[in-house]
Amino acid sequence: VSYAIRGAGRVAETIVSHPPSQLCISAITLAELRYGADRLSSQKLHRALDTIARTVSVAAFDEDCATTYGRIGAKLAERGEIIGDIDTMIAAHALTLGVTLVTNNQRHFSRVPALRIVNWF
């Protein structure tokens, strides 16, 4: 999403090629982006995030996601492949929903077993 807002790569054009009903954003991802917008004091970024939140579904992080998060986090820790709490939550969310995660951070997310990832950059 951050690349689409910045106009980097092919992200924005790939997003608009999909109907909004086929897309969603994790509430965790939205929170991470809101944090960045506040750190930058960027009203422009907040307006872009408002538009995204009105256009696509914002998926809530629920109890099933929390259970998946615990399982994935423990497995990654056992293997010494920790990717950070936020990325683990995002991965758990995608797995719980059974969706493909769109990311440019394949280095981290490829460590999560069974997670489908695609890079639209």
Give a label for each model feature.
Residues 57-104:
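Active-site neighborhoods of divalent-metal-dependent phosphate/nucleic-acid chemistry enzymes
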Residues 107, 117-121:
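Short, C-terminally biased terminal segments at protein or domain edges
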Residues 1-25, 35-56, 78, 107:
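Short, well-structured N-terminal submotif of metal-dependent ribonuclease cores
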